[in-house]
Structure formats: C-alpha cells, structure tokens
Amino acid sequence: MRIPFLRDLLQSDSIYICNNITVNNLKPMASFLGKLGNPELGGLPLKEFKHRQALHKQAEINTMLDVPEFIHKAHNIYGYKHFINDVGGSLCELDAPDIFEILSANTIILYIKASAQNEDELIKRAITDPKPLYYRAAFLEEQLADYMQQYQLPYVAMINPDDFVRWIFPKLFYSRIPRYQAIADEYGYTITTKELYNVRNEKDFLDLIEIAVARKIS
C-alpha cells in the first residue's frame, strides 16, 4: 500500500491479489506465517507473529480433522485407491490428542526416523535457506528469551529474522524428535530413512509397512 498507483487500484477493487497455493508450492502460506524480527528486514513484530502462529496452529488442526473427508473424496470423486497424508513437521507441536485419534483410526501413521547424516543435511539446508517455522508458544518464549540475552538485544525489532531462524532451527529440530517418537509409539509405527531409500515401488512400500508393524508388536 506504499505505492499510490497500486493502492488506488486495490482500494477501488480494480485489481486483486490471489495466492497461487498448490501441493508443490506452499510459499504463499509460509510467507504469511513469516519470521520474527526487524520489519526492515522482512520480520514481524512479536504480537503479530504470535497471532499468525496461532492461526497456523488452528489451521493445521482443522486440516487434520478433515482427513477422513479428504479420504472419502479421494476415493469417491477421483477414484484414488490410496491416500497419503504428508503432514508437516509441526504436527508434533500441536498438542491436540484428538487429531491423533482420528488419524490413527483412518490412516497408518509412519514416523520416518532420520539417520545422523540425514539430520545434519536437514539442519544444513535450514541454515542455508531459512524458512518460516511454527513453534509451540512455550518453546518460542523460552528460546526467544535465550536469544535476546545471548545477543544482548533489548528489542525484538532488532532481531535479524533469518539469523534467528538459523539459530533456533537445530534446537527446534532436536526438541521435536522425542515428540515424533512418542506419537509413533502410541499411535503409529517407525521406519528409518535408510529403509525408505530402498523402496522402489508399491510392493516395497507395503512390505516395509508390514515390517514396521511386525517390529512393533514383536
């Protein structure tokens, strides 16, 4: 709205902005979630950041609650035999047991446990290209206080948004691992990235699920 020409067109409904969200392009959603910090560097004030975090959490919960309906539509409208719910990593942060009851009743929950090498690669990728992330409220409060103290920053507006993501991601990543495992232990099954790399077709995948199930009940 800083450009008068575009502002006039938007306010008169002469043009509109539409997010092009697809299965392979979730950047509009990530852009809305945003990063915390200096507005001049693209960051958000703490109050607005927390507001968007809360919206993201509720949206993710609602999406998981819709999974049974999505399965029904996939089968009856599109004729798909199988349904894969490729959930985001923040699923373990939602603290909403109801969604795991629904997911376990309608899908097979698989936790893909990363090797040490894969963990290093994921962290390096996040540091190289820091992206917006969802944080549990208590985790954010604790880590933000540590960051502000460590770098002696009196105001959130002084935070470099990308630097904060680079700093917090490894801590977030390792805090999530026991949460993933707890979900798998109670509601699902665990496979490893090494096992998954060997999957080449549907039969391999189904065989791997059988192995995971047998491993848990043995």
Where on the chain are the PLM-derived regions?
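Conserved phosphate-donor/acceptor-positioning beta-strand/loop module used by diverse small-molecule
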Residues: D86-V87, I102-Q149
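Hydrophobic beta-strand segments of well-ordered beta-sheets in folded domains
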Residues: K81-F83, N106-Y111, G188-I191
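A short acidic (Asp/Glu
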Residues: L94-D98, E121-K124, D204-F205
